Amino acid sequence: MAEPTITTTYAGQFAGKYISAALLSPSTIDGGGVTVLPNVKFKEVLQNVATSALLANATCDFDAAGSTVTLTEKILTTNDLQVNMQLCKSQFFNTWQSLEMGASQFSDLPKSFQDYLLGYVAGKVASEMETTLWQGAAGAAGGLTDGGFTVLAAAQLPGANIIAPAAVTAANVIDELGKVVDKINAQTNIYGFEDTRIFVSRNIMAAYVRALGGFSVAATSNAGVDNRGTMWYADGGGVTFDGIKLFMAEGLPNDTMLAAQISNLYYGVSLLSDTQEARVIDVSQYDGSDNVRVVMRMAAGAQIGVASDVIYYGV
């Protein structure tokens, strides 16, 4: 079968499903770890409202003198991003053919070769965005204007809300998580809220799972959750610490944690913007090669709403 010649362009809202796959598929976003603002073209104003004591003794008059309302703002600025990738068409076309003919166990098949290529690239972008969302430097090429959440936290949080990290192992993970919860109670009022999370790196989650398996103490005195040892986590269920849910953020660097409410971490994207684009360009008809180029244009940014309500364990 001859290889197809394909040149396809999706622009504006028609590019949405491909840009959405790239921007909303990072594991943190897909798992509901942050608040997504879907239609930010350049800037979004995040308004914070603080009030003084509102209740007073009843009188016959209206008297607002005792109630003070303070409005502050944070700005979420998106950065225009692009993907320019050149792929050898024949290598991917063979894989796509096998998928179309049923030589695969996957049930969701690409309807066309360009869908397959765009899906492949979107998956790569999503993986890169997960890391950028958490630890990308401010203003870095291909990154976010103000940086990822750890960069924002290091720059915005009061010193009392930042904990110097240690090398976390199964032997000390309970103590290190305890430091975070102690700071939550001492410096914020977010304990007990349904959307409060402690976002942890992979190695911290692994250390905690092992610790709960009973191997951070004498095996004779602790056989782990339900006496199952490290097998207790076989179902992959969620875990908590001192009543707070843990969220494994794959983009966090090792030995890093961030405690916050989901409603206080913002991720802005341009899903509804007419400036986004997803394009597949077959250049074989122009230069005789067997190459196809994939182009995507989008925008994304991150911001913390109220910095004083966040605890950061990291550098």
Language-model segments: residues:
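Intrinsically disordered or highly flexible coil/loop and linker segments, enriched in small
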Residues: 20, 24, 126-135, 190-193, ...
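Alpha-helical scaffold segments that mediate packing/assembly in large oligomeric complexes
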Residues: 98-183, 313
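Ordered core of a single globular domain
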Residues: 175-215, 219, 224
